[in-house]
């Protein structure tokens, strides 16, 4: 509502996060642009992978730092299995359910093949959503066919991302400022910074789940300790097979 705001630069430094969190932020950027007609520029820092790139695709222009790692277009679902650990310490879990699939994903037993099929279908659905979101944001730069070829979950350097049309240019924060000025038809402007503190409970979407991984400058060791079962647009190589 402040008429003095003529452009927004979003600095991204994140490996990604939960599917829903990523989609909410992406949608908020689109809604902001539609309501205000104010241009939004994405400035990728060290990491802008998976959910971070999902968010960037909502912006009018994407700039990556020369050392940025981005990409990781895909979905990961995490279901820990601690059955053998409990067996070693003599603990058994007795679970009563109303149906065979009610405790799907339980960490207290091995996952059944039919459960894997259910979760794989969900992962595939979220992956198609990811592809469509990126395509809608980048369709003037890349076709869906080319996007599908490079969206296999791998990460890219800034130079590779530029070659694949996932970003618009490589530069520094001054490049983002120059682009924001150009998109808003200004020759100069005052730059004001806003910082988001993750534990703030002041927004519409704030819930107790904020104590779990979200988008921001997370400590990955802490993230591993708090990662709950679910579906993520997240690059987390520590969970490698």
PLM segments and residue spans:
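Catalytic cores of alpha/beta
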Residues: 52
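Flexible, glycine/proline-enriched loop segments at strand-loop-helix junctions
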Residues: 71-73
């Amino acid at each position: 509502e402040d008429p003095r705001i003529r452009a927004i630069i979003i600095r991204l430094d994140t490996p990604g996060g939960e599917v829903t969190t990523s989609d909410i932020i992406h949608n908020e950027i689109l809604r902001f642009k539609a309501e205000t007609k104010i241009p939004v520029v994405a400035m990728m820092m060290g990491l802008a992978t998976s959910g971070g790139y999902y968010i960037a695709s909502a912006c009018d222009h994407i700039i990556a730092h020369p050392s940025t790692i981005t990409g990781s277009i895909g979905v990961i679902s995490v279901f820990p299995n601690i059955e053998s650990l409990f067996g070693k310490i003599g603990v058994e879990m007795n679970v009563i359910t109303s149906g065979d699939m009610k405790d799907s994903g339980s960490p207290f037993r091995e996952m059944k093949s039919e459960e894997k099929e259910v979760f794989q279908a969900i992962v595939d659905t979220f992956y198609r959503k990811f592809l469509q979101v990126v395509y809608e944001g980048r369709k003037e730069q890349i076709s869906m066919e080319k996007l599908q070829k490079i969206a296999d979950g791998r990460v890219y350097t800034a130079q590779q991302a530029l070659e694949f049309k996932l970003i618009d240019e490589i530069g520094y924060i001054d490049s983002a400022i120059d682009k924001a000025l150009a998109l808003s038809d200004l020759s100069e402007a005052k730059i004001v910074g806003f910082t988001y503190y993750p534990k703030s409970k002041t927004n519409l979407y704030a819930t107790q789940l904020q104590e779990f991984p979200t988008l921001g400058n997370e400590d990955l060791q802490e993230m591993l300790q708090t990662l709950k079962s679910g579906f993520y647009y997240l690059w987390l190589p520590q969970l490698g097979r």
